[in-house]
Amino acid sequence: MNKTKQTEQKEIGRVKLGDTQDLVVSIVDNEKLDLRIFVKTDSYTGATKRGVRFYLFDNNWTEFKKLIDEVDKTYQELA
């Protein structure tokens, strides 16, 4: 019998993108950051393939945070 490891996913928060879409941020297996679009329509409710997942502990988090800081800086300059 094949045993597959269950994925543990903990939602951190979400941002409403529209009437039927949210951006959901989760930690997966205590080692990966997942940013995923979730939809709620008459025909489907749940995660889509649109999103990104990366490991937190191989310097990706540091680089991603720097990128978010740059986005925030640019946003502040535009506002």
Model-based region annotation:
Residues 2, 30, 59-60:
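Detector for Asparagine
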Residues 48-79:
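Mixed-charge, Lys/Arg-enriched low-complexity segments
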Residues 15, 27-30, 71-74:
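Compositionally biased, intrinsically disordered low-complexity segments
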